[in-house]
Amino acid sequence: MILTMLKGKIHRATVTQAELNYVGSITIDKTLMEAAGILENEKVQIVDINNGARLETYVIPGKRESGVICLNGAAARLVQPGDKVIIIAYAQMNEDEARKYKPSVVFMNDDNTIKEITNYESNE
């Protein structure tokens, strides 16, 4: 059986731009992409904490250390600069891989600098 599991996540990033007149996608600071294990052109889910919108798109790298989080194209209608978002990448793996895999979870400061990187989430 193949399971779809959390691969990596950028938690509570601040949207810096929304560019309607662009082909599509989300632009993410390359440093943040690497910290979360997210690749160029990878499909991601974006959850807007402010308004509850959920969408899927693909990633293009932004300038390293810029803090850019820019929703492009039609996705720009669903977010506003200043909104907090969660950017989630998933991976398919078998059950043995899923039990061993530890996702990269990147917690953000308000200025889109990295607050903490962990390899798990815990509600304990």
From Swiss-Prot:
Cofactor requirement: pyruvate
Annotated localization: Cytoplasm
Description of post-translational modifications: Is synthesized initially as an inactive proenzyme, which is activated by self-cleavage at a specific serine bond to produce a beta-subunit with a hydroxyl group at its C-terminus and an alpha-subunit with a pyruvoyl group at its N-terminus.
Reactions catalysed according to its record: L-aspartate + H(+) = beta-alanine + CO2
Pfam families in alphabetical order: Asp_decarbox
Listed pathway(s): Cofactor biosynthesis; (R)-pantothenate biosynthesis; beta-alanine from L-aspartate: step 1/1
Keywords, sorted A to Z: Autocatalytic cleavage, Cytoplasm, Decarboxylase, Lyase, Pantothenate biosynthesis, Pyruvate, Schiff base, Zymogen
One GO term of the biological process aspect: alanine biosynthetic process
Chain positions found as Pyruvic acid (Ser): S25
Signal peptide residue numbers: none
Enzyme Commission number, as recorded: 4.1.1.11
Active site: S25, Y58
Co-factor binding comment: Binds 1 pyruvoyl group covalently per subunit.
Enzyme class: lyase
Binding site for substrate: T57, G73, A74, A75
GO cellular component: cytosol
GO molecular function annotations of the record: aspartate 1-decarboxylase activity
Family the UniProt entry places it in: Belongs to the PanD family.
Assembly and interaction partners: Heterooctamer of four alpha and four beta subunits.
Functional summary from the UniProt entry: Catalyzes the pyruvoyl-dependent decarboxylation of aspartate to produce beta-alanine.
Name the record gives this protein: Aspartate 1-decarboxylase
